[in-house]
Amino acid sequence: MLRTIVTKIFGSRNDRILRRLNKQVRIINKLEAEFELLTDEELKSKTTEFRTRLKNGEKLENLIPEAFATVREASKRILGMRPFDVQLIGGMVLNNRCIAEMRTGEGKTLTATLPCYLNALTGKGVHVVTVNDYLARRDAETNRPLFEFLGMTVGINVPGLSPEEKRAAYAADITYATNSELGFDYLRDNLAHSAQDRFQKHLHYALVDEVDSILIDEARTPLIISGPAEDSSELYMAMDKLIPILIQQDKEDTEEYQGDGDFTLDLKNKQAHLTERGQEKIEQWLMEKGFINENESLYSPARISLLHHIYAALRAHKLFERDVDYIVKNGEIVIVDEHTGRTMAGRRWSDGLHQAIEAKEGVQIQGENQTVASITYQNYFRLYEKLAGMTGTADTEAFEFQQIYGLETIVIPTNKPMIRDDRTDIMFENEKYKFDAIIEDIKDCVARNQPVLVGTISIEKSELLSNALNKAGIKHNVLNAKFHAQEAEIIANAGYPSAVTIATNMAGRGTDIVLGGNWKAEVAKLDDPTEEQIEEIKAAWQIRHDTVKQAGGLHIIGTERHESRRIDNQLRGRSGRQGDPGSSRFYLSLDDALMRIYLTEGKLNFMRKMFTEKGEGMESKMLAKVIAQAQAKVEAHNFDGRKNLLEFDDVANDQRHAIYEQRNALLDNEDIADTIQVIRQDVFNHVIDEYVPPHSLEEQWDIPALETRLKQDFALDLPLSKWLEEDNTFNEDVLRERVLTVAISEYKRKEELVGQETMRNFEKGVMLQTLDELWKEHLSAMDHLRRGIHLRGYAQKDPKQEYKKESFQMFTDMLDTLKLSVITTLSRVQIRTQDEVEKAEQARQKIAERENAAMQYQNNEGTSSLHEKSEHKIGRNESCPCGSGKKYKHCHGSKAKY
């Protein structure tokens, strides 16, 4: 109450920031008349002038008025569009490391040109991030003429580019890219084996379009580069046959309640849990099928893999639905993004879930993969020096943006007042009554020439509604993951009078629905249109536009509330753009997922009693409050999940950062001999410590074991026992010094044989290969640790602290293993002289001749006997002619046929 009173008097923080930025807008507006008088060449030269001033020490912020005035004037001349004052404010907000909430149709694409140009002046690169490659290409091509006029280069980074094209994209002043491609390029750069194979420059400034979709909705989706793992497709098919015999029970067993089912479902977290009865039933089934022995437990360490497959199959059957969570296309399982309704080609669920769904649907089961490199969007975008974002719906997630990314959300006012009529939600007893009411609403709109956009939350629901509309004889278009290819055309026609469009989670996000239809799309269909044709199309559009405006603009129908208010607002935001009329209404039922999952049975029963007549709808303030509470619960739950993920991933992120930093230093450094020398000294001291404890008595030394270890691991045959007997001054320090001296001497001998350059390259190659292999194994071990760490809570231990402690120990162990493996490999490598190589080649040729003769013998005995007489056969125990010193049977003779 007090806070509201104070805000009314002094204004909110958002209001105060807008007032401050308006002062800058007035300065920019004063410059407009001056910049209009500049010639094109004078306007272009401003870029060089600004860059020179920056090099001379002027701050970037001081250039804002002139730089923005330059972009505004260039935009007027090149694009035929003048950025509004609110767009100038949006540009300044984006430059200030903030998120700009700009309503649909307010020109976010044009707004982005202002901070992009300003930050590109630094020469450090600007990345404009979009949710898909269509938007990346569209925005880049739209703004390219403007930036190139001002002397800036523009690049597009999307999947499928060649290395040269990708390198050129990153070299540009401003690069338009998809979020996933940027993340994967970062991972690929940190798997590169030469500095020239890396693409990304310094991560300076990222401007993220649809920032809520990328940094909130996809925050829990890790980007993973993986390699093949052990195949277990038969096991997935076997476990798939188990699921039909299992019975679900509504809630978990407690002291007061004992159900009769085999498993329970956690719909909020999409997890399944076995009951004791379920475990016993499964164990019996596994014994009958021969998967486990009698009296063997499902939870024994040797059978954990079986349990993993069972849970994957259970989740696949009971928690993931076809045409809701995924579709089957060309014999493959394709994930459907729950937030956008788009298919996510190439993406696969982890933890065996994807394979379990493939088994469920009877398609080919693709092999499991092992993680080679991974990062979340949360941690990737926090690598940028400067991060900003824009969207039409950010204010509801402002707290999370601030907490996780340190980004403040500023709501930008609309250029024209918004006049959309957002009507009260209507609740129905069940889905049938709800759909009946929706059909009636659509009929009314169609009769009045009003276009309708109907939003559904899944492909399944969109097809149910489509069938109902077909029965009612209403023409309509369906936009979901199955009809993704027709998206642009469907959206272009969605604003026509009486047009009815069904969209899954507003999959057409990023494209405006124009009242009366998109006349530019009509022109684009014509080959070389004349001015007369264009004018005819525009005139026809104007009539349709006026008709739709008179009918009330675009009408939005939501078929149920989403878990997040933000997704609902995105749907509503398709209507009422740039001061256009419009309306919206959500139709709900007690069968909706939000109601079933997040409202108690008591509340649902109470609400059912409020319906006195069949098919009646109910709207009230209490209903709005109940829905708001349910959505708040979900948002809080999802935020906790993302925050929890980040806290765990931050541990891995610190380790990832340390490894990648060292790896890049390796790539950039031509000579790592000094590093190898430091590691060698550390490794030998550590090995000697195992057999000769520091400051210990001679009786405690295990010299024979140390001799064996040095010979096996480092190819050093040293007479340590003899040194100890013959030298009275031989002590621990002398031992360490002599061993290291001999090791270095032997290594230098090898280096002299091959040359310094070859040895330096070999050292780097061994270091990189060993590091990559151990890091891959470490990621797998961390993943296993993370999956089971929550069980520590039962022992009254904090799982997060335990994870931090154990993962740190695993990391230090990995580094110790890295050092030992590198020095062991370098010490044991055998160097051959040119003479030895030539002898080996001669021996190889002789062996090949004998093998050919043996093959001829099988076809023609006579010629074979002549050959055998003319050539001496090398005995298996004779020295190999290659000069290696080994017996023939242990060298090239191992490949010969006898």
Swiss-Prot record:
Tell me yes or no: is Glycoprotein among this UniProt entry's keywords.
Answer: no
Q: Which SUPFAM superfamilies match?
A: Helical scaffold and wing domains of SecA, P-loop containing nucleoside triphosphate hydrolases, Pre-protein crosslinking domain of SecA
**Catalytic activity from the UniProt record:** ATP + H2O + cellular proteinSide 1 = ADP + phosphate + cellular proteinSide 2
The residues listed in the UniProt record as binding ATP, with positions renumbered to this chain, are Q87, G105, E106, G107, K108, T109, D512
Instruction: Name its co-factor(s).
Output: Zn(2+)
Keyword hit for Zinc: yes
Return the Polar residues bias intervals.
855-865
Q: InterPro entries this protein is in?
A: Helicase_ATP-bd (IPR014001), Helicase_C-like (IPR001650), P-loop_NTPase (IPR027417), SEC_C_motif (IPR004027), SecA (IPR000185), SecA_CS (IPR020937), SecA_DEAD (IPR011115), SecA_motor_DEAD (IPR014018)
Start-end of Basic and acidic residues biased regions: 866-876
| Any single Pfam family the record assigns to this protein | SEC-C
Q: What's an example of a GO molecular-function annotation for this chain? A: protein-exporting ATPase activity
State the annotated membrane topology for this chain.
Peripheral membrane protein
Q: Where in the cell is it found?
A: Cell inner membrane; Cytoplasm
Where in the sequence does UniProt note compositional bias of the Basic residues kind? 886-898
Gene3D superfamilies for this protein: Helical scaffold and wing domains of SecA, P-loop containing nucleotide triphosphate hydrolases, SecA, preprotein cross-linking domain
Record keywords? ATP-binding, Cell inner membrane, Cell membrane, Cytoplasm, Membrane, Metal-binding, Nucleotide-binding, Protein transport, Translocase, Translocation, Transport, Zinc
**EC number, as in UniProt:** 7.4.2.8
Protein name as annotated = Protein translocase subunit SecA
- Which organism was this protein described from? Histophilus somni (strain 129Pt) (Haemophilus somnus)
> Lineage of the source organism?
Bacteria, Pseudomonadati, Pseudomonadota, Gammaproteobacteria, Pasteurellales
* Gene from which the chain derives: secA
